[in-house]
Amino acid sequence: MVSQMVTIINPTGLHLRPAGLLCKEALRFQSSIKFEYGNTTANAKSVLSVLGACVKCGDEIELICEGADEKEALETITELINGGLGE
């Protein structure tokens, strides 16, 4: 298992478009990919789970990957989030 703290920089947080992009990228990996925000744990491979976490701009999440390709998954998803998730 690998994890990293990441700050959401999207002005409108994780709304539908960036949540969809995050999930699409997460689904490429075999590893379990989730994030923790406050008391919430969200499955990064589920748009509804990501949206349900209600993550806003400036919020810090802990991205957690576990599985065969966990390091690559963590690096890729972290880069995507740090790049603004297409916004």
Question: Where does each model-flagged region fall?
Answer:
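Compact, glycine-rich, soluble single-domain proteins
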Residues: T7-C57
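A composition-driven signal for long, intrinsically disordered, charge-rich low-complexity tracts
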Residues: M1, Q30, L85-E87
